[in-house]
Structures are given as structure tokens and as C-alpha cells.
Amino acid sequence: MPQLLRDILCVIETFHKYAREDAATLTCTELKQLIQSEFEDIFQPCAIHAVERNLNLLNIDSNGAISFDEFVLAIFSFLNVCYLDTQSLLNSEPRQVSKPEGMPHDMGLQVTNETDQWTEGTSQTQDKVVLPSGTASSTHLSLEERAVEHNRVDPQGHTTAHKLPVETSEHSDSKNQHLKGDEQSQKVDQDVSATGDSRTQRETSKPMAGSEQISSHTKGEGQNKEILQKGDILARKQSGTETGGRFGEQEGSLGILHSPLEETTQRPGGSSEDQEVAGEKGVKGHPKSQEPSVQGKDEPSSEHVDLPKQAAARKPSQTQKSAAAKDESRTAETPEPPIQEKEYETRDLSVQGENRNVSETPMVRVERKGVRGPEVHQTVGQKQIEEKTQPPALEEPTEDKKYHELQESSKEKNAGEDSETHELNSEGGEQKDSESEGAISPGEEARHAEEGTAEALVNSKNAPEAEGTPGTRERIWELTTLENQSGEKNKMTTKIHDKLVKEDDGYQGEGSEPVATQNDERSPETPNSLTAEDGDSNSETSDLFVQGDSQSQTNPFRGSVQGSDSNNPETQKHLALSEEKRVQEAAVLAVRGEDEQVTEEHAQEHEGQGSATTGRGPAVEPRGHSDTQVFIVRDENTKSLEPGIPGAPNAGITKQLSVRQLPTKKDSRKELKDQSPSTKKEEDGALEAQEDLVKSLDENNAVSQKTCPATLEEETESPQQLAGEQSLSTKEHDPSVSESGLEERMQRDQELCLVERGAEHSSPLYEALQEKMLQQTNVTQGEHQNQAQTASVASPEIRRNQSSASLTNDSSDGLVFFIDRQALQKYIREFLPDEDPTGAQQISAPQALEDKQGRPQREELEPQKEASAPKQ
């Protein structure tokens, strides 16, 4: 009440202030001055003119003066009309002004409405109020004015025509979200014009119309964005990226909501370009997860451009560098797969648009099914690698420096090898892809193997290649059971291999040819791309990546090649051939097992080593299965034989790889030769034992005879020829080593291979042969046992060191693996010093001799032998 009384007093004082002539009435001039001075922030100039024109409505008695009674009634009648109009505006849509007093028309501007309201309201009070002029007091007038101001402050009674649009817009925000920017722009203009300039409403009204157009333009722009995003979503769906599409829709809706706000807060007079920029800025204000979306669409940031460009450009650059070091003719072929990958990545960029980082992984996973995942698979793995290890430019110089010495020494021989390899590549069809991928960054395999394992687990869930994993696990489990069932091992072996053939055929029929091609394509890429550069460590690393379907996707670079080659009809043909060979090899090896004690000790040793290297790249394979365990320590020769190569795009590659890796193992065991020398007699006895063993295998192994009847005949011839070639090639690089020493090392390598296989597939026949051979070699058992114990104790520690060293230096891989194989070889030699040397040879050599492409691969092996010596 006290406030109300003060306001009334203010109205009275105001009236008397302007009633100067007689202090009781207001003339037309005085009333005009009062309205202009006191109500200028309420009324528009047009309203003041309307009051002046319609002054006769206020001057009811037509005496030319307005008394206080007339003034009070007229003002409150007018304020009542304004209040009702304000309430109707607040409760209805904008521009729909209620006319409780029967206004004649709506001009589209609140100003005109207020003028009409004034006119109507005053006309209705005309009959009721008769105001004699000069009867009002200035105190009454000031009270009236304060009442008007109070109404203006009242949140419900915003009677000002100037602020009406603001209240209206604020109220209608919840209903019309796209107009929110208009009201905000008006608020800004009105705050600026708070000084009370009566011309502000005109300026505000024009921006209102302009801002309406802006908001409609914003809506149209948002709809355009929706249309574009829907087009992107359709494109993504066609390529199998529904997940990325959902992200695009979410992002599109957010962008539409935010862009009107940001655009209209720019001044209403802004151009459409400014609005687009504002919309982009509004979307850029999203969380960081959404930020790359708009950047990918309109303003790609340096990070986004760098990642795909690095992913695409880095492949050709690395491939060209490594290929140029090896052969100029191969360089022309090598960049082709990266170009295809770059096209895929470019398409991914255009299709994904805003969703580059948001939905990168889901998109790639789904798209891999449609595109068969070659380049996309690599894109994911390589981007993850690049995010963790940037810049890639640092990786290439390190590798180039490391391999530079090896390249110079092997350049002359690579000239001849590469010419033959060129023919091999043309015959191999899409094997060029695997070469290029292998040449990309072999050193990265070891460094990124930790990430690779996690990626393999993720990728295997989405990629079709993972369908072959159950078969491999069943294989591992069944082969493990072979060790524990000594009585029925031969029978189970035959059944298992028959089953494996069916399984592999089934998986291939289900469209998971990449499973069969996966390991195989990695095998050829290792000899082709790493010949002169990587030496032993990287060849071992690559071969270890080949092993096991559980790790078949560990290396994202390798996995990218699988899908493309698996569609090749030649690849499918070679799959069948390689399956038959694998059945034959497994059957032959099944009869050559070692006693179960050695098997258990090997398993324990490998498990101990595996526990220390769980973070290790090549040795990341699960250690629970003996089959996988043997892969880790088994030499590349054995790796290229069975599950490492379920099917090859080029059968010759498989054979070549097995032959090619033998001298690598020989060089890695130069130290072993000094520790455990054997005599010519042992070698001769070993050869005789091998011939006997081959004969017994021919009699007892029906599977191998049915699968490949001519294999064993070639096996008897191949060891001597292979030994001669390898001894010559090794002589060139290491003249100090005698030919007999080379043969000895070769036999030891092969012995190691078959002893490990024998550990899985021991049989009564082989045990009988083993006892016979053990009697001949009792002389050297004590010496070998001591050395084996020393090395086996040291090997877990070496493995542990290897897990940390592999991330920083690739050369440590070769050294550690060499020592581990030496330890295992010494450990095995206490049981079978010279028993099986030709076994591995007989399996690997016929594979190399059956195909014309074997010799180039064997010749390419020589640079690897050079690489092993410096790394040791």
C-alpha cells in the first residue's frame, strides 16, 4: 500500500506539473507535452499524433481543456486496453493481437495496434467521462504517471508497445524455437535503445521483419542441411554405414537447433554468408566429439585433414621408399594398392562427412562387410596407430637408417631377384597388394603389436575374416588333445585333418575366404617386401603375425590386404591346393612326434615365456594352446607349413617361404653351432635315419599318400639340393663358415621344426625310431643337456626384456627370437640331436620345388642372412 500511495501521489504531481496555466486543467498543448515527456518510452510518435488528432475524444465537454478527472479516466482506460492487449499477446502467437475493444484493423506492427487501442479506448470512455478543463491538479497527474510506470515494471503488465515484441518473443520461445534468435536480436536492439528514443520501435520493427526472414532463412538452411545429411546418410547406408548415418542425424539435429541461435544473434542485417558462418560456429560449439563433424563437412581442421592424408599418402610414400630400395620395376606396381586405398579413404571422407571421428569405427566395421574390408581395415588400424605414434615421418627415417646397410650389401642380388619376383608378382595376381602392404612399415608391426592385439580382438568381431577363428580354435584344442592321447594319435590325426578340410571348405563357402587367405597373404608379403630390409627380426615378426587366426588381424596393415585378395579366383584355387598340402603336412608330422615329456616341458617353457611377453607384438598369441605355443618359438620354416598357411593366393609363395626362411634360422644359430657342434657322422646318421623315416611314413601315412603321392619322392631329392643352394648362398656372405657347418645348421633348423611338430603328433612308430636314434647319440646328450638348461633358464628373462625392447628397437626382436630358438634347439637336442633334420626339409623343399617360383624366393633369402649377423 505505501508504494501504491506514493505512485498515486506521483501521478497527481505530474498532472499539476504540466497544468501550468490554471493548475487544474490541461490544454491540448500541455497534454501533448505530458505524453511526449512522460510516455515517450511507451508510445510511438504516431501514437502521440493520434492523441493530438483525437484530443476531442478526451475533451468531452469540448471546452478545449482536460480536467484531472478526465485525465485519470482516460489514462486508466487506455492503460486497461494496453494491459488486455499485452495479456492477449503473451497468451497467443506473435502478431495475433487480441482486440477486446473492437480495434478496426491490425497493421502488422504493434505500434499501429497501440494507436488503434488508444483511439478505441478513449472513444468508449467518451460517454462516461465529462472532464471540465482546468480541474485537474499536477499531483494527480504525477500519480497517474507513476501508476503507468508501475504497470510497466509489472511482469504481467508490460504495457509498452516498445517492449511488447520482446515479451511476446520470450513467451513464444517454448512454442516456436526457430524464432528464438529473432527475439534475442530484438532484445539486443532494445537494450541499446533503452534511452527512450521514440524512433527505436520503428528500427526494431524493421529488424523484426528482417529477423523473421533470417529465421525463415535459418530454417531453410537447416532443412537444406537435413537434406544434405539425409543424402549423406543414404550414401552411407548404401556402403553399409548405418551407424555413421545415425550419428549424422543426431549431429544434423543439433546443428539445426544451434545454428538459428547463433545466426540470429549476429545482427539481423547480416548477409546469408554471415548466417552460414554463424551456423557453422554454432555447430562448432558442440562438444569435442561432435566438433569434427562440421569441420569434416565445411571447414576440415588440420587434424582431420592430416589424419586421412597421412593414412592415404603415407602408404604410397612408405611403399615407394621401401620398393625403390629393392627394385625400380617393383615401384611401378607397388603404389597401385595404396592408390586404391586412398580412393577408398577419399570416398570415406566424402561419405562420412561430418561423422569422421564420431562414427569412424562403426562405419568402418559395417563398411568392411560391403567392401570386404581391405583398405578400410587398414584405415582404422593405421589411424589408431598414427594417433598413438605421430608423426609417421619419424618412423620411416628410423627404418630406412636401420635397413640402409642391408640394402647396400644386397642390392646386386636383389636386381636379379626382383626381376624374377616381378614375374612372380604378375603371376600372383593381387599379391602385389600384399607386397605393398608388407613394405609399408614392417618395423611398425613390432612396435604396434600391443595395439594390434587389441585391434584384432575388436576387428575380429566385425570383420568377416573372424568367422574362421572357431575352426582354428577347434584345431588348436584337438591338436592339444592329441598330446594327451598317445594310444589313438594316428587315428585322431586322420580324423582331425579330414574334419579340418571340411571346416575350411565350410568357412570358405560361408564367404570367409579372407580367413584362408589371411595368413597366406601375409606370408608372401614378408619375403617380397622384407627381403633386403628387415633381416631376421622382421621376417620372424611378420611370420609370427601369420600364425593363428586369433592373431590373424593383429596387424592392421596386413589385414587390409586380405579382403581384396580373397575375391580373386586364383586365390580360391590356391586355397584348395594349400589345404591339401596342409593335410598332407600335418599327417606326415603327426607320426613324427616326440615323447610326451618333451611336449609338456615345451609347453611349460613357452607358457613361462608367454607370460613374460603378453604385451609383446609377435608373441602376443594366446598361450593356452600348445599349437599356438609352438608357433611362437617354432621357426619360420614351420610357421609357413601348417596353420600359418591355410591357403595361399599363390601356392608357390607358400613353398618358397618355407624354403626361404631356413638360412635365416641357420644364421641365427651360428652361436649355437659353436656351443653344440656335431660331427659328420651324426649328419650321415641323421640322413640315413631320415630315409628310414620317410619309408616308414610312406607305409603308415595313408593321408599323405592320397593327398600328394609324389611329395615324398621329391622330399628324398630335395634335402641335398636345398643344402647345396643354401650352403653356396651362405658362403657368399660368410666365407669363414664351412660347407659342412652350413649343412649341419640347416639340419638343425629342420630338426627343430620337426621336433616341435613331433611334440604335438607323437606316435608309437616315431617313438620306436626315436629310441633307435637315441642309442646312437648318447655320447653328446650330456653336453647338450647342460647347454639347454642354461639357455632355457635365460630365455624367459630374454623374453621379458624383449617385450620392452620391441617397442623401441626392432633389432631386438631378431636377437631374442634367435636366442629363444637356440635355447629350444639345445633343449630338444638332448633327446633328438640328429634325428629329424630332413623332416622339415622334406616338407618345405618339395613345396619350393613343385613351383617354378621357388627359386626367386630362395635367392631373395640371402639378404636376410646378412641381416641376421649384424643383429646378433
Curated annotation (Swiss-Prot):
Q: Which superkingdom, per the lineage?
A: Eukaryota
- Where would I find the EF-hand domain in this sequence? 46-81
Q: Which Pfam families does this chain map to?
A: S_100
Basic and acidic residues bias (residue ranges): 142-155, 164-190, 218-235, 296-307, 324-348, 365-375, 399-435, 486-505, 571-584, 592-608, 664-684, 730-751, 849-865
Q: Where is the composition biased (Polar residues)?
A: 117-127, 538-570, 699-708, 718-729, 774-793, 801-812
Record protein name field: Trichohyalin-like protein 1
Tell me the segments the record calls region Disordered.
117-759, 774-813, 830-872
Question: Which is an annotated GO molecular function term of this record?
Answer: transition metal ion binding
Q: Which PANTHER family match?
A: TRICHOHYALIN-LIKE PROTEIN 1
Organism (species) = Bos taurus
